[in-house]
Each structure stands twice: as structure tokens, then as C-alpha cells.
């Protein structure tokens, strides 16, 4: 009688497989920690105040802070008064990147946040619920002498959230407000060498545009992009892991189709998990080096969402298939209460992502958080997804508890068995618990390394060796889930190892009433397999 490989594998072989996977896991962490640089780099920019004295500002004129055709600059706002320069004539210009540097497609994306330096003036204070309106133009070029090409031009509103900690008296004039940073721009590809931002703050007192926003002294930006070195390591990992998971997936399904029965639910779910892992592994990002694909960030979010939804569904079905009655198991409809929250939560996060990054495909300055309605809508989606996640977690904890309780109850039958049979099923129970604990360990490691990467300084030093913690987190966790899926497809593939006829009627099969099972893999056409019978509840219980 054949079962899953995990049922027929000796403890020694299981430990060897576990040791090999552990070695690959350590290598995955070391690749990120020792070879790859930090995942991202943050570059501060201070906008240069250029002067555009044309009477008509409707036609875009690019004002560069430096270079062959640099603009006429002023150092501060006070310098504009004697020169009779109006607020509408001042253009805040930012050249990306800094002098003597170039952007690269290996940077993958650009994210910018905005910081305003606003001075307190008694006659020009920030009013309540103040909103700044910026006229922003984004241009690009690929050499230092060609003309700028417009990439985007939008009116960008942002709500100011500023506090002034000192008393609002004349002696405190000139001190700066404490203002929250504002989301400014996100681009899903870096296809050009140079970018130019021109930010205008048009003032219209009749329409109350940019009135009551205080005296803006400077505009500062922080640009965040992925490091090219990390991108190359990341692409190399995806290129290596894609065929690895694909080959084991084909091998797994081939062994299932060789059986004389149709696949059971757990086998189908494991195969679907392998497909979702392969989908997230396929290194389509290589094409972003040669093509201006701004949708890659959104596509990456969708791929991750599909994988995690499949992973969460697998955990539920894996537990359920080891605790349900015979007629309830092997049907996805029996899990609608548990899988339903996963579907609802995933759909909410998908809609939220489409409302944010989907719109950014045409307007890189858009942010759903900049308006009250957008903020409430985003929070609603996130809260619903959070509630679904909590419900899922409660369902999962309850099902895991039920599985272990059923196993503990059935273990009382083991002493009455023959020694060979008892040792066989004790091994099955051990392997089932082992796999459950490995699942818990993977989830715990994901959370722990995420927290460590957030609270650490980004890297640790031991003598002359520098370990990039954040990079190790990304490569290690990514490698870990690949190894997890690999192990599932390998251990739960049907085994071609059969027990002899004498054993079937002897030590391993003395009485039909003693027949016990740990997995839901059906070993022959007529009956269920070994782990299932051990863990399923009897209908009368």
C-alpha cells in the first residue's frame, strides 16, 4: 500500500532532507546579508528657487537648477522682494539625480516624499485645514544637452498638517512649523538617466488658492530607489529559483497523474500553491531593464497577493483535511467559512492597490491619502481586510487545536498495537506534527525578521564583516517560502514504495479496526490513507 513520501520516509532520511533545506535557507540569508547591498537608498534633495519672469506661464518652460542652461536663481524669498519677483514667478526646481550622477533602470522605481520648511509670520499664519496646491511638471532626458521631454504635468493638492510649539508672538517670528512629511510621487520604472521637477505654487486670492499656507522658505524632497546591486542579486535569485520550483512542480503532478485515482483536494491545493510560487518567481523584471514598464510595481503586488492568498488557503485546507469526517473532506465547498475571509480580504487589498498604484500609472503624483474621502475609503478597505485576517487567524488556531486534540485522542489506541505497527504510526504522527511546527516556524521567522529589519540600523558589523539586515530579510524570507513550497511538493508527492503482502496482513495491518492514517493522500481507489484515519473525528463524536 503506497502513501505520501512523508509517510514512507524514515526519520533518518527526513532529517537529511531537512538538513539540506536548512543549508539552502542559510545560504539565502547569507546572499542578502553578505553579497547584496541595502535594498534601497534615500537621497535628499533641496529645491532650487528659479525665477520665471515670463508674462505667460501656460506654455511649459523647463527651468534646471544647474547644467548648460541653468536658470536664474534666488537664494531666499527675501531676495525676491527688492527684485519685484512675485510668488507666481518662483519655480522650485529639482534635478534628479544629483550632479555627476545618473539614474539607471536597475533602480526599478522612484518614490518621493515632500517636506516643507514653513516659517511663522504673524500676518501670514497657517490656517486650519490649510491645503497647498502645487503645479508640478516632470520631465526627462537621456543626455545633458538634449531638450527635456514632458512625462507628467498635474495640479497636486496636499493637506498641511503643521504645529507650532512656541507661543505665537512677534519674538518667535521666523521659527519653523513642525510639518508632517507628505507623499509626493511614485514611478514604477526608471527608464531614463535624468529627471527634472518644476514645482510652482500659484497664488490666487480670489479662489483662495495657496492662501493661508504660511511663508514657505524651502521645499525638500527625499527620493528613494532600489539599489542596483540588490536588484541584480534579486534577479539572480528569481532566475535560479524559477526552474527549481517548476521542475519539482512538474515532477509532483506527474506522480499524481500516474496514480489510478483522481487527485484529492489537498494534492490539488499543493499543486496550486506551486503554480502561485512559480508565478511569483518568473523573473519578468529582466524586461524592465530594456522597457519602460511603469506597471511592474502593481504587477508585483498582484503576484504576491495571489501567492499569499493561496498560502493562507492551503493552511486552512491542510488542517481541515486532517480533522474532518470522511464525507466532509475532499471538497472545497466545505471550507467556505474559512476561505471566505481570505477572498474578501484579498479583494479589499486588491481594490485598495488599484486605487493607489493603478491611478499612479497615469498620474505619478496621485495618492489616495491626500483627500478625506480617499483616506476614509482606504481605511475602510484596510479595516475590512484586517477583520478578515483576524477571523482567519481564529479559524486557523481553532482547526490546529482540533487536529492536535484528535491526534492525542487517537494515540491512546497505539499501545494495543504490535510493536512494528505502533512504531510506524508514531513516526507518522511525529512527521505530521513536525510539518505543522515547520509551518509555524516559517510564519514566526517572517514576522521576527520583518520587525528586526524595521528597528535595526540597516546593517550589523562584526569586525571587518558587514551584514545587511534588510537585504538578508528579503532574500532569506523569499528563499524560505520557496523551500517551504518545494518541501511540500516533495514530501506530499505519492510514494511508489509498497509494503509487502505479508506486512499488509501482519504487523502493519493486523485488524481493520486498527487502520490509522495521518495524511489525506488516498493510497488506493477504495479507501483513505493513513494519517486521515488517525486524525479524523468519528461521526458519533
Swiss-Prot record:
Disruption phenotype: Mice display embryonic lethality before 10.5 dpc. Embryos show defects in the establishment of the body axis and in the primitive streak and mesoderm formation. The chain crosses the membrane at residues 16-36, 233-253, 269-289, 304-324, 332-352, 381-401, 432-452, 472-492. It comes from the Eukaryota. Expressed in the brain, skeletal muscle, heart muscle, lung, gut, liver, and kidney (at protein level). In the brain, expressed in the cortex, striatum, hippocampus and to a lesser extent in the cerebellum (at protein level). Expressed in kidney, lung, skin, intestine, brain, spinal cord, skeleton, eyes, excretion glands, tooth and palatal shelves. In the cerebellum, expressed in Purkinje cells. It is found in: Golgi apparatus membrane; Cytoplasmic vesicle membrane; Cell membrane; Endoplasmic reticulum membrane. Keywords: Cell membrane, Cytoplasmic vesicle, Developmental protein, Endoplasmic reticulum, Endosome, Glycoprotein, Golgi apparatus, Membrane, Transmembrane, Transmembrane helix, Wnt signaling pathway. It is a multi-pass membrane protein. Disulfide bonds: none annotated. GO terms for molecular function: mu-type opioid receptor binding; Wnt-protein binding. InterPro entries: WLS-like_TM, WLS_GOLD, Wntless. Residues 1-15, 254-268, 325-331, 402-431, 493-541 are cytoplasmic. Residues 101-232 are annotated as: Interaction with Wnt proteins. GO terms for biological process: anterior/posterior axis specification; cementum mineralization; exocrine pancreas development; hindbrain development; intracellular protein transport; mesoderm formation; midbrain development; positive regulation of canonical Wnt signaling pathway. Residues 37-232, 290-303, 353-380, 453-471 are lumenal. GO terms for cellular component: cytoplasmic vesicle; cytosol; dendrite cytoplasm; dendrite membrane; early endosome membrane; endoplasmic reticulum; endoplasmic reticulum membrane; Golgi apparatus. N-glycosylated. Induction: Up-regulated by WNT1. Transcriptionally activated by beta-catenin and by LEF/TCF-dependent transcription. It holds the Pfam family WLS_GOLD. Belongs to the wntless family. Interacts with WNT3A. Interacts with WNT1, WNT3 and WNT5. This is Protein wntless homolog. The gene is Wls.
Amino acid at each position: 500500500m503506497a502513501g505520501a513520501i512523508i509517510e514512507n520516509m524514515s526519520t533518518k532520511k527526513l532529517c537529511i532532507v531537512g538538513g539540506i533545506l536548512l543549508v539552502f535557507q542559510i545560504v539565502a540569508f547569507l546572499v542578502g546579508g553578505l553579497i547584496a547591498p541595502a535594498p534601497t537608498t534615500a537621497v535628499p534633495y533641496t529645491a532650487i528657487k528659479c525665477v520665471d519672469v515670463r508674462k505667460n506661464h501656460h506654455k511649459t518652460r523647463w527651468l534646471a537648477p544647474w547644467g548648460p542652461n541653468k536658470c536664474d536663481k534666488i537664494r531666499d524669498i527675501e531676495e525676491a522682494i527688492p527684485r519685484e519677483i512675485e510668488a507666481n514667478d518662483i519655480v522650485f526646481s529639482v534635478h534628479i539625480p544629483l550632479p555627476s550622477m545618473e539614474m539607471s533602470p536597475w533602480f526599478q522605481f522612484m518614490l518621493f516624499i515632500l517636506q516643507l520648511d514653513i516659517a511663522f509670520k504673524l500676518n501670514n499664519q497657517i490656517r486650519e485645514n490649510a491645503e497647498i496646491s502645487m503645479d508640478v511638471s516632470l520631465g526627462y532626458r537621456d543626455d545633458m544637452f538634449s531638450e527635456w521631454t514632458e512625462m507628467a504635468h498635474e495640479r497636486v493638492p496636499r493637506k498641511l498638517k503643521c504645529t507650532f510649539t512656541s507661543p505665537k508672538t512677534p519674538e518667535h517670528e521666523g521659527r519653523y512649523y513642525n510639518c508632517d512629511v507628505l507623499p509626493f510621487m511614485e514611478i514604477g520604472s526608471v527608464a531614463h538617466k535624468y529627471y527634472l521637477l518644476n514645482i510652482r505654487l500659484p497664488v490666487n486670492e480670489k479662489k483662495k488658492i495657496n492662501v493661508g499656507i504660511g511663508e514657505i522658505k524651502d521645499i525638500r524632497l527625499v527620493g528613494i530607489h532600489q539599489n542596483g546591486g540588490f536588484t541584480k542579486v534579486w534577479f539572480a535569485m528569481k532566475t535560479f529559483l524559477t526552474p527549481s520550483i517548476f521542475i519539482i512542480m512538474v515532477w509532483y503532478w506527474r506522480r499524481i497523474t500516474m496514480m489510478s485515482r483522481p487527485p484529492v483536494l489537498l494534492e490539488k491545493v499543493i499543486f496550486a500553491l506551486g503554480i502561485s510560487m512559480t508565478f511569483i518567481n518568473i523573473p519578468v523584471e529582466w524586461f524592465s531593464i530594456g522597457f519602460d514598464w511603469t506597471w511592474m510595481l502593481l504587477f508585483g503586488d498582484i503576484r504576491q497577493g495571489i501567492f499569499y492568498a493561496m498560502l493562507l488557503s492551503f493552511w486552512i485546507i491542510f488542517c481541515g483535511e486532517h480533522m474532518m469526517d470522511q464525507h466532509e473532506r475532499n471538497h472545497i465547498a466545505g471550507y467556505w467559512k474559512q476561505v471566505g475571509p481570505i477572498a474578501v480580504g484579498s479583494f479589499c487589498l486588491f481594490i485598495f492597490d488599484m486605487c493607489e498604484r493603478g491611478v499612479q500609472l497615469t498620474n505619478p503624483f496621485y495618492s489616495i491619502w491626500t483627500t478625506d474621502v480617499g483616506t476614509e475609503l482606504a481605511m475602510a478597505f484596510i479595516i475590512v481586510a484586517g477583520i478578515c485576517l483576524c477571523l482567519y487567524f481564529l479559524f486557523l488556531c481553532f482547526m490546529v487545536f482540533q487536529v492536535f486534540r484528535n491526534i492525542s485522542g487517537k494515540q491512546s489506541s497505539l499501545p494495543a498495537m504490535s510493536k512494528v505497527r505502533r512504531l510506524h504510526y508514531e513516526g507518522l504522527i511525529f512527521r505530521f506534527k513536525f510539518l505543522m511546527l515547520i509551518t509555524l516556524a516559517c510564519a514566526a521567522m517572517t514576522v521576527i525578521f520583518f520587525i528586526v529589519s524595521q528597528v535595526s540600523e540597516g546593517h550589523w558589523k562584526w569586525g571587518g564583516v558587514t551584514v545587511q539586515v534588510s537585504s538578508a530579510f528579503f532574500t532569506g524570507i523569499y528563499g524560505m517560502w520557496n523551500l517551504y513550497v518545494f518541501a511540500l511538493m516533495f514530501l506530499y508527492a505519492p510514494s511508489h514504495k509498497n509494503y509487502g503482502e505479508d506486512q499488509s496482513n501482519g504487523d502493519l495491518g493486523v485488524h481493520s479496526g486498527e487502520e490509522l492514517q495521518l495524511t489525506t493522500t488516498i493510497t488506493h481507489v477504495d479507501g483513505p490513507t493513513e494519517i486521515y484515519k488517525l486524525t479524523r473525528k468519528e461521526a458519533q463524536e
